[in-house]
């Protein structure tokens, strides 16, 4: 008997624009994804979040913590420039040198969790981060502390981007970027284990968001040699002027959606016993 593998397919960025929200809802209804993570900091989250409530028992609904590029919910002076959160490169450098206010980050993350719970009426099933910021030095410890304090005994699980070096090589897709994110995920995975917080077992979905790539082939690479409880991040959507102004991956979102909604996607999962 061949055991079926359990695969998590998480659509990131619910809330980023109305069109992305509609695409994610359509994928949920078609049973093509298993989770979505919500960008509560965006202006397009709160009203559309109500549409997710009826799918509460069908998919995992998590929070996509955001500390880059958008306008924060609080006055977080150490991470903003003219009222807007700094870019991911600057945040990475600040995290390495711990050049920011822990109390400001603590407050901002709690406010984002408050907004999620107010919109949906329940705590997030899991926690991850826009640009993987939840894994950055110090921020990872802050998040673990918040989880333990806010949700004693019922911890949300947390995403990690750690993956086997040999599996990354085997998949032959954005190898350097995948290795970087894998290293980045080591600490949060360790912290989760030490604190009895569940986390995924394997990670893929990393590529350069090029529209010249065959996303169907990329996805086949993503599911090469996976563990049970492996997680693939996806970024489906529909491009428009709003998305173009805030998201570098805007053009590839259409390609991802078209593949995920297609019959080819379903057949690939069946063929690979997923």
Give names to the regions the model predicted.
Residues 1-8, 18-59, 66-126, 136-274:
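Terminal accessory/targeting
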Residues 131-134:
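Short histidine/acidic/glycine/proline-rich micro-motifs that form metal-
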Residues 11-15:
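DG-centered beta-turn motif at the end of beta-strands
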């Amino acid at each position: 008997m061949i055991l079926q593998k359990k695969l998590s397919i998480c659509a990131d960025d619910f809330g980023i624009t109305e069109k992305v929200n509609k695409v994610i809802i359509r994928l949920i209804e078609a049973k093509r994804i298993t989770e979505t993570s919500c960008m509560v900091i965006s202006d397009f989250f709160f009203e559309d979040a109500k549409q997710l409530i009826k799918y509460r028992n069908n998919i995992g609904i998590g929070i996509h913590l955001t500390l880059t590029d958008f306008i924060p919910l609080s006055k977080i002076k150490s991470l903003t420039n003219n009222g807007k959160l700094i870019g991911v490169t600057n945040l990475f450098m600040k995290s390495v040198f711990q050049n920011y206010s822990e109390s400001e980050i603590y407050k901002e993350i709690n406010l984002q969790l408050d907004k999620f719970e107010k919109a949906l009426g329940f705590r997030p099933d899991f926690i991850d981060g826009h640009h993987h910021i939840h894994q950055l030095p110090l921020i990872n410890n802050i998040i673990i502390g918040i989880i333990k304090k806010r949700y004693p005994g019922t911890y949300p699980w947390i995403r990690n981007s750690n993956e086997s070096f040999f599996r990354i090589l085997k998949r032959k897709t954005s190898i350097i970027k995948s290795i970087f994110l894998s290293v980045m995920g080591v600490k949060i995975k360790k912290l989760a284990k030490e604190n009895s917080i569940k986390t995924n077992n394997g990670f893929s979905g990393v590529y350069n968001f090029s529209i010249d790539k065959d996303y169907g082939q990329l996805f086949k690479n993503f599911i090469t040699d996976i563990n049970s409880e492996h997680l693939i991040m996806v970024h489906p959507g529909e491009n428009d002027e709003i998305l173009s102004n805030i998201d570098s991956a805007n053009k590839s979102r259409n390609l991802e959606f078209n593949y995920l909604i297609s019959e080819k996607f379903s057949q690939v999962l069946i063929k690979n016993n997923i």
